[in-house]
Amino acid sequence: MLQSIIKNIWIPMKPYYTKVYQEIWIGMGLMGFIVYKIRAADKRSKALKASAPAPGHH
């Protein structure tokens, strides 16, 4: 169902989107990648803090 809707919209719009919005797609991809990297780094730092002894306990 959803795939047919995507195909019906995407196929006629594809040349327009690929030409006009190429820069936007690249920008969105980069933003998504950066956000993913930040989240991954945040998770890693939280995991390190959780595994490290709590402050005040020497």
UniProtKB/Swiss-Prot annotation:
Transmembrane stretches in the record are 22-39
The protein's superkingdom reads Eukaryota
InterPro entries for this protein = ATP5MJ
Q: Which keywords has UniProt assigned to this entry?
A: Membrane, Mitochondrion, Transmembrane, Transmembrane helix
Q: Which GO terms describe its biological process?
A: proton motive force-driven ATP synthesis
Coiled-coil stretches noted in the UniProt entry, renumbered to this chain: none
Q: One Pfam family of this protein, by short name?
A: Mit_proteolip
Q: Which GO terms describe its cellular component?
A: fibrillar center; mitochondrial inner membrane; mitochondrion; proton-transporting ATP synthase complex
Where located? Mitochondrion membrane
Give the record's membrane topology: Single-pass membrane protein
Family as reported in the entry's similarity comment: Belongs to the small mitochondrial proteolipid family.
The entry's function note states: Subunit j, of the mitochondrial membrane ATP synthase complex (F(1)F(0) ATP synthase or Complex V) that produces ATP from ADP in the presence of a proton gradient across the membrane which is generated by electron transport complexes of the respiratory chain. ATP synthase complex consist of a soluble F(1) head domain - the catalytic core - and a membrane F(1) domain - the membrane proton channel. These two domains are linked by a central stalk rotating inside the F(1) region and a stationary peripheral stalk.
| Complex and partners | Component of the ATP synthase complex composed at least of ATP5F1A/subunit alpha, ATP5F1B/subunit beta, ATP5MC1/subunit c (homooctomer), MT-ATP6/subunit a, MT-ATP8/subunit 8, ATP5ME/subunit e, ATP5MF/subunit f, ATP5MG/subunit g, ATP5MK/subunit k, ATP5MJ/subunit j, ATP5F1C/subunit gamma, ATP5F1D/subunit delta, ATP5F1E/subunit epsilon, ATP5PF/subunit F6, ATP5PB/subunit b, ATP5PD/subunit d, ATP5PO/subunit OSCP.
This chain's protein is named: ATP synthase F(0) complex subunit j, mitochondrial
The organism named in the record is: Homo sapiens (Human)
